[in-house]
Amino acid sequence: FPENISQVHFIKLVLKDEKGKDVSSNFYWRSNDKYEGSKTLTGPTSSGFEDLSKLKAAKVKLSYKTRQADGRYFVDIVMKNTSNGIAFFNQLQFLNSKMSPIRPSFYSDNFFSLIPGEKKTVTIETGEEKLADGAVLVLKGWNIDTQKYKLK
């Protein structure tokens, strides 16, 4: 890594197929601190990440569509980071009217970061019977304002 890299930095790896379509991606955050030990289990694995608290606020635009099929309920969510900085460590939640998780619910992805301009689609699936009391979709993250949507 270059000597002038920031104390905390981010690495995004994307695997594409022969047509250029994303197949898989991984996102990492890394500290400049030197880790001791052969596999860092004996090193200061939490050291050097204090600068995460200095991340500037980011904005994520969210839209969603709901659909039903074969007794299943789906929420297709599209999110885009519209800011110039990273939207770090975001989480989607699918909650009932009492703000408790709807279980079981299956997420195509969760706990993700978005680089500037990045768009991400996530689908949440559950049984239609789980929605008797309504549902709330929540997006929250390290440096974004929490967003809540009451689903119909």
Where are these regions (language model features)?
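Short, hydrophobic/aromatic beta-strand segments
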Residues: 25, 85-93
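Asparagine-centered strand-capping/turn motif at beta-strand->loop junctions
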Residues: 77-84
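Edge strands and adjacent loops of beta-rich recognition modules
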Residues: 36-70
